[in-house]
């Protein structure tokens, strides 16, 4: 919660979209400050490696990830922290996960098959012991659409415009991704074939990755 100390000792953490500590206004580095005031010095080594997560929900799915240029930039089959780091290194720190109307079946298949793809297995307000619930996820996505974190469109042209990415670039990226899905092998980034879900049937969605 001390931005000045973060700038000095953990500058990478400043790339995150939001910084949240619980309880709020704690973790201010008071003990470090008192030690330095008493003559101590911070250990001279590399900067603290901040752990940055993705926000749960529509932005954590393991579908096609594109940057602000409409280009794929990573193997989406990684943990949420790796996704955050890759996303933050993209132009303007912007990235989206793009998928189609089959998303609920695809995500449930990933959860039931223990495939992950970086998504969060649990759901907010999920009763202990209950499985992943499609209706809860639909409600979560609806809220994300309302909040502007997810955009939806009937065509890829319209989706690209709502995302603010080059239309032709996004369409070319989706075409290439669908080719890899049909082939069953990710020649570009090595993603597992089980997670290569094609993007073919509208409406189409894009969830903003938030770290």
What do the predicted segments below correspond to?
Residues 41, 164-169:
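Helix N-cap / loop-to-helix initiation motif
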Residues 169-211:
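A glycine-rich dinucleotide-binding beta-alpha-beta segment and adjacent secondary-structure elements
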Residues 1-52:
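Glycine-rich loop(s) and the adjacent beta-strand/alpha-helix scaffold that form part
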Residues 30, 158, 169-172:
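Extracytoplasmic/secreted proteins, especially bacterial periplasmic and envelope-associated proteins
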Residues 32, 41-159:
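An anion/pyrophosphate-binding glycine-rich loop and adjacent beta-alpha core
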Residues 37, 161-162:
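Residues at alpha-helix termini
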Residues 22-24, 52-56, 87-88, 196, ...:
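Short Gly/Pro-enriched turn/cap motifs at secondary-structure boundaries
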């Amino acid at each position: 919660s001390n931005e000045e100390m973060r700038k000095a000792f953990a500058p990478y953490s400043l790339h995150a979209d939001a910084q949240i500590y619980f309880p709020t206004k704690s973790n201010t580095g008071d003990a470090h400050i008192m030690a330095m005031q008493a003559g101590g010095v911070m250990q001279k080594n590399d900067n603290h490696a901040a752990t940055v997560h993705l926000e749960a929900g529509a932005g954590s799915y393991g579908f096609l990830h594109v940057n602000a240029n409409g280009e794929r930039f990573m193997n989406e089959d990684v943990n949420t922290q790796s996704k955050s780091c890759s996303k933050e290194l993209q132009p303007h720190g912007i990235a989206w996960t793009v998928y189609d109307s089959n998303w609920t079946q695809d995500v449930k298949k990933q959860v039931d098959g223990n495939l992950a793809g970086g998504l969060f297995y649990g759901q907010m307000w999920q009763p202990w012991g209950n499985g992943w619930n499609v209706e809860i996820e639909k409600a979560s996505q609806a809220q994300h659409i309302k909040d502007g974190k997810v955009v939806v469109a009937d065509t890829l042209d319209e989706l690209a415009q709502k995302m603010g990415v080059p239309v032709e670039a996004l369409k070319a990226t989706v075409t290439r991704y669908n080719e890899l899905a049909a082939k069953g092998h990710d020649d570009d980034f090595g993603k597992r074939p089980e997670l290569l879900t094609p993007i073919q049937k509208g409406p189409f969605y894009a969830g903003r990755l938030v770290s």
